[in-house]
UniProtKB/Swiss-Prot annotation:
Belongs to the MSDIN fungal toxin family. Residues 1-32 are annotated as: Disordered. This is MSDIN-like toxin proprotein 11. Keywords: Toxin. NCBIfam families: amanitin (TIGR04309). It comes from the Eukaryota. GO terms for molecular function: toxin activity. There is a cross-link at G11-P19 (Cyclopeptide (Gly-Pro)). Residues 1-10, 20-32 form a propeptide. InterPro entries: Amanitin/phalloidin (IPR027582). The keyword Plastid does not apply. Probable toxin that belongs to the MSDIN-like toxin family responsible for a large number of food poisoning cases and deaths.
């Protein structure tokens, strides 16, 4: 899921502080 986060939010830091939140947001946006 690192690639998704990096592609979605390149400006934000890597998924360390809140990987779940980032993943969820990306999943929701990607899935719809």
């Amino acid at each position: 899921m690192s690639d998704i986060n990096a592609t979605r939010l390149p400006g934000m830091e890597p998924p360390s502080p809140m990987p779940c939140v980032g993943d969820a947001d990306n999943f929701t946006l990607t899935r719809g």
